[in-house]
Amino acid sequence: MIPLDVGWRLGAHAQVPLVQKTTTNFETESADHEFGLGDASFQAVVAHAINDRWAAAVGTRLVAQTAAGSLGSGEWQVQPGLGVRYMLFELGEDCYFVPSMRYAMSIPGNAQARRISEPQIAPTLNIDLPGPVFITFYPSNDIRINYGAPVAGQTGRLFFPFDALIGVRLSDQVALSLEGSVPIVKAYPVYNFKAEVKLRMLF
């Protein structure tokens, strides 16, 4: 985070994911496997610390159409968002609750791609465990409400998963984590199961 003024900071986040995707056809008992580069993203956020417990932030995330095949959305996206942080010092030094929402919108340009228009929500709860270990519930904005074009198998607008992450701080700047998610409500199908290994580096 870059200090701007008293209580104000500018943060940036870049991500270039490698994606392994498996699509299973239970009728033919076959599975298709894809591996490659996913959609790269860049995010800029302005945050304001109100006091020791409360902080708020607004920002925008840009998602580039860099994925091959079906490993990405097939669209450039812009995702403005906001969030509020409340520190839970009673549970631990780095325990906090951060409800956040961003609105994903596709940028016109690809007439063949599906139009994207969906709120993406994350009621993130981070809890410190003994030592360098931590657990986070809903670390990703994976609760989604689809107002864009429908997808195959869609019966409603809501996708609501159970999403959790366990990680370890390797140093003050580096953390390694494993995230797993399974759908609870899949009226708007996004995935059947998601697992991500993340290496986070702070500068």
Where are these regions (language model features)?
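Transmembrane beta-barrel domains of Gram-negative outer membranes and organellar outer membranes
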Residues: 1-109, 115-203
